[in-house]
Every structure is written in C-alpha cells, then in structure tokens.
C-alpha cells in the first residue's frame, strides 16, 4: 500500500480533547491508517487518464483507498487531497479534492474484506446522489488564477497532473464524533481547517502520500 503515517491521537493517549489546544488536535497524527493498493497513482486517476475519464481536460475519476483502525468515537470523515510539491511551481499547495461530513454509517462494509472501510473508485462523482449530506470543497481549478467555472471540475476530484516532475500528493483524513458545522457545497479548504480547529470532537486522523507521475 501507499506510505501511511500514523501515531497516537489525543484521545488514544487519554487526554481530554477539551484540554488540548485546537491546533494540537488538528496537527497531531492519530491512530487512523490510510492506505491504497498502489504507491504511484494509476493512469485512470491521473495525468494519463483517457479522454472519457476527463472533464474539460481534467482527470475526474477519483482513486480508491482504505481507512483502518479508526477511533470508535469517530462518526464522520473529512479529507483533503493536495499537492505540496506544487509550491515551487505555482507558489501554493494545489487543492485536488476536499471532502467533509461523510457519515461512516453511510459507507458499505464488506465483512469479507480485511479493511475496515473502503472508499471506492469514482466516489467523488457518485457522492451527490449516494450521500447528499456529504459536501465537497472547491479545488484550485476554482481559483482566480485558473478560472474554471464548471462545478464538475471546481467541486469534484481533480487528478494529479504535475507539469515539471513527479510529485508526492498528500491525502489527510480526519475523523470527528459529530458533523462539522458551517460547511456547504463548494467550501474552501481553509474553512475545513477552521472547522476542525473550532470543535472539540476531532477523534482521529491519518495521512498517506501517493506519487503522481509527470
């Protein structure tokens, strides 16, 4: 699987969340493990995607991944798929896919699968009809520097298309006991960060990195 980063969450250490500074809750890596069946993003989800897997030239079929060892107190999932390696290229971390308020109970469990939860391929495009209460945020395609106005691109998964060399993409997933308030379809990523800092029920989190080929 992809490289997964895991540690001890405040809850797992027995520290009351209300007594931990908000920024610590957000930044301290939890017990949750995020993984995939690949370390390099497959073509269908990235720069080499076929025309039928693109919208306005952008790969829009989201990749599958697994979430394991989730804190039992977690009831909702939120994530941000971003490209830190875009910073030297364009001056900021490119936002590829923010998601918030995904109810864990809405995900199907396969008791024959060794993984606790699986996010299936093409989940981004299926979400509005499958789980309408879950919201997807704006990608960097919505920025004034890019100017896309198509919501199928600005508020859906955008696959890796590094222009200069291979980039390592970050998928950061958080678990909370309750939904995050104030987030609507098309939220900006900073709004997700503010919401995570402003609540006292962030129970767990995990990160993995996937390489996108140039």
What kind of region is each of these model predictions?
Residues 25-214:
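N-terminus-centered regions that define maturation/targeting leaders and the start
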Residues 5-6, 17:
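Cysteine-centered motifs
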């Amino acid at each position: 699987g992809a490289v997964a980063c895991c540690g001890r969450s405040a809850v797992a250490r027995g520290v009351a969340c209300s007594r931990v500074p908000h920024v610590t809750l957000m930044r301290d890596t939890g017990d949750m493990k995020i993984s995939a069946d690949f370390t390099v993003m497959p073509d269908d989800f990235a720069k080499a995607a076929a025309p039928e897997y693109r919208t306005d030239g952008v790969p829009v079929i989201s990749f599958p991944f697994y979430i394991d060892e989730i804190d039992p107190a977690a009831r909702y999932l939120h994530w941000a798929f971003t490209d830190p390696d875009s910073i030297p290229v364009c001056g900021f971390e490119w936002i590829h896919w923010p998601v918030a308020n995904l109810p864990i109970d809405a995900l199907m469990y396969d008791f024959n699968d060794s993984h606790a939860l699986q996010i299936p391929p093409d989940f981004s495009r299926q979400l509005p009809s499958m789980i309408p209460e879950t919201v997807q945020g704006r990608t960097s395609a919505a920025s004034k520097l890019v100017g896309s106005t198509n919501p199928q691109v600005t508020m859906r998964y955008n696959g890796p298309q590094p222009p200069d060399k291979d980039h390592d993409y970050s998928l950061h997933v958080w678990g909370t006991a309750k939904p995050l308030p104030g987030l609507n379809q098309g939220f900006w990523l900073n709004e997700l960060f503010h919401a995570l800092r402003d609540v006292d029920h962030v129970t767990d989190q995990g990160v993995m990195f996937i390489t996108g080929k140039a």
